[in-house]
Structures are given as structure tokens and as C-alpha cells.
Amino acid sequence: MIEADRLISAGGTQVEEVADRAIRPKLLEEYIGQPQVRSQMEIFIQAAKLRGDALDHLLIFGPPGLGKTTLANIVANEMGVNLRTTSGPVLEKAGDLAAMLTNLEPHDVLFIDEIHRLSPVVEEVLYPAMEDYQLDIMIGEGPAARSIKIDLPPFTLIGATTRAGSLTSPLRDRFGIVQRLEFYQVPDLQHIVGRSARFMGLEMSDEGALEVARRARGTPRIANRLLRRVRDFAEVKHNGAISADIAAQALDMLNVDAEGFDYMDRKLLLAVIDKFFGGPVGLDNLAAAIGEERETIEDVLEPYLIQQGFLQRTPRGRMATVRAWNHFGITPPEMP
């Protein structure tokens, strides 16, 4: 199983990136959820504009699909500057980064997605650029090689990562602003789904938006993906109108249950409950029982189940919680 193949995967595709671009909020006043991030960024941006400075470098981290790219776009729009976008894996050589930096206008935003995947050579170039707005470049090779300094205009680097712990300390310490995006609450997701439905020209009730939001695993990207599939169902089965009942029927047909679990989530939980009496069960045994790689369980399946309180990691192995038993209508065993 590949994470990208799952309807409830938080990872995005190129097609979704294009589709989502049209419905993304452009300004902070349109930004839904993340109230602490929103209020802090409003202050930081206004202060930078009052001083006539570039915004401090910004690190955004958190699970995939929560709007790191959206926030970077909003920052550039609020500052009234250009946004240049790239990603860690694309910047293979120091020259790749140097080319982007030397093309920036004053106060522009350079957005590097997956910044934790920068190579050490490229990262070294970033240090003086972030700290002193200078590039140190080596010209020539061998004994004739010499270093030259190129002045850069003041700019803002926005780095995005799902793995803040993978950043080196020297890089992490150069960000003046650090923001963590949290999973969204259902009311905020309902608002996002309703807004997206209006942009897509859909007839959708508040209850229909709530049904999609409940199953979106706290993630706007998943919410918008589910909305598109519910739209397809509604257009074929119900003349396009989306009620709570139609949304529920569509998502049930797609095997996304009331908790946002798909077939693989349920398969894992039921294996722990049925085959191992609720656990504890070792990771290798669990992987063999459901026919998956242990890395898939650790990196793809487990995190959301643990976050939502359906699965526990213990020193002796994985255990299903009482909430997991109740989800399937099975009476949990009495604790000794």
C-alpha cells in the first residue's frame, strides 16, 4: 500500500495543487483556524510593514495538509511582495540556491518546502544569506580558487517541514519566527468545506459540510478532497445538492467511516482486537498479520490512530484502546 493511494492521505498531488490554488485564502482575514498563528502573524506582518523591513525568517512545521504553503502565500500577499517557491530536494547544488537568491527583489519571500531535505552544501550557503544578506561563493578550483561576497537585498525565507526535529540546530536557530500548525477542529473544517463548496459553485447544506468535516481527519487538504468526491456522488445521485445524508452516503461508499478511517485503518485495529485480543502485539507480528511493511505501519497508519486515542504504543507492543473496541461495537475485555 502506498500512502498517496489512500483517499484520506494528507499528502498532496500536482493535480490537487492546481485545483486547491483557486480556493485558497489569499489574506489573513480569510484564513480559517489556527487562531494563535493567525493573531501572531498579523502582529509580525504589521510591525514589519510599519518599519519598512522584510519580515523575519519564518519556519512553519506540522503534519502534512494543514496549509503551510497557503500560509506562505498569505504572508507574501500581506507584505505586498513576490513569492518564489522551491523545495529542498530540488536545490541540489549551491548554485541552484544562489540563482534564486540573486533574483530576489527587496523584501521578497523565498519559500522552501521540505526544507529538512536540503543538502549540507546548500544549507551552508543559506547561513550567511539568512544572517547577513550575503552570498559567499567560491570562484575557480584548486589553488586559484577564491571566495567572493555578493550582497543580497533583504528578504524573508519561509521554510516548511513536517519534520522540524530533522532540521540542524544552526538552520533552525536562524529563523526569527517559528509557527506550528495543529490539526483543525471540526467547526473550522466545516467552515473551510462550506467556503470551498461556494467557490466550486455547489449547493451544500451546513449539515452536509459538517459531515465531510467530521471525516476529514483534522486536515483541510483531506476535507477538500472528500468534498470533490462527494460532489461527484451528488451530481450523479442527487442532482448536485449535498445534504448531510448525501454526504454520508457518498463517504460510506468510499469506505471513509465516521472517524475518518479507511479500510487500512480498520484492518489494523481489527487485527489487534481480533487476532491478538486487543494486544499488546509486537510490530513485526502486526505487520505480518495485515500484510504490510512495518515502516508503513509506523509512518502511515499508526500516527493518526495514536493521536486520536484508538491505539497505544507500549514497551510490550501495540494495544487497542477502549475507544477502538467501542468503535466496532465490540465489548472490551475487563481489566484484571
Curated annotation (Swiss-Prot):
Provide the residue positions that the database annotates as binding ATP: I23, R24, G65, K68, T69, T70, E131, D132, Y133, R174, Y184, R221
Enzyme Commission number(s) from the entry: 3.6.4.-
Q: Name one GO biological process term.
A: DNA repair
- Sites where the protein binds DNA: R294, R313, R318
Annotated region (Large ATPase domain (RuvB-L)), positions in chain: 4-184
What molecular function terms (GO) are annotated for this protein?
ATP binding; ATP hydrolysis activity; four-way junction DNA binding; four-way junction helicase activity
Question: Where does the record place the region Small ATPAse domain (RuvB-S)?
Answer: 185-255
Q: Where in the cell is it found?
A: Cytoplasm
Pfam families per the record?
Answer: AAA_lid_4, RuvB_C, RuvB_N
Q: Name the enzyme group at the top EC level.
A: hydrolase
Disulphide bonds annotated for this chain are: none
Q: Which GO terms describe its cellular component?
A: cytoplasm; Holliday junction resolvase complex
| Stretches for region Head domain (RuvB-H) | 258-336
Which reactions is this enzyme annotated as catalysing? ATP + H2O = ADP + phosphate + H(+)
Which PANTHER family does this entry report, sorted A to Z?
HOLLIDAY JUNCTION BRANCH MIGRATION COMPLEX SUBUNIT RUVB (PTHR42848:SF1), PTHR42848
Known partners and oligomeric status: Homohexamer. Forms an RuvA(8)-RuvB(12)-Holliday junction (HJ) complex. HJ DNA is sandwiched between 2 RuvA tetramers; dsDNA enters through RuvA and exits via RuvB. An RuvB hexamer assembles on each DNA strand where it exits the tetramer. Each RuvB hexamer is contacted by two RuvA subunits (via domain III) on 2 adjacent RuvB subunits; this complex drives branch migration. In the full resolvosome a probable DNA-RuvA(4)-RuvB(12)-RuvC(2) complex forms which resolves the HJ.
Written domain comment of the UniProt record: Has 3 domains, the large (RuvB-L) and small ATPase (RuvB-S) domains and the C-terminal head (RuvB-H) domain. The head domain binds DNA, while the ATPase domains jointly bind ATP, ADP or are empty depending on the state of the subunit in the translocation cycle. During a single DNA translocation step the structure of each domain remains the same, but their relative positions change.
Q: Which family does it belong to?
A: Belongs to the RuvB family.
Q: State the name under which the record lists this protein.
A: Holliday junction branch migration complex subunit RuvB
Organism, scientific name: Citrobacter koseri (strain ATCC BAA-895 / CDC 4225-83 / SGSC4696)
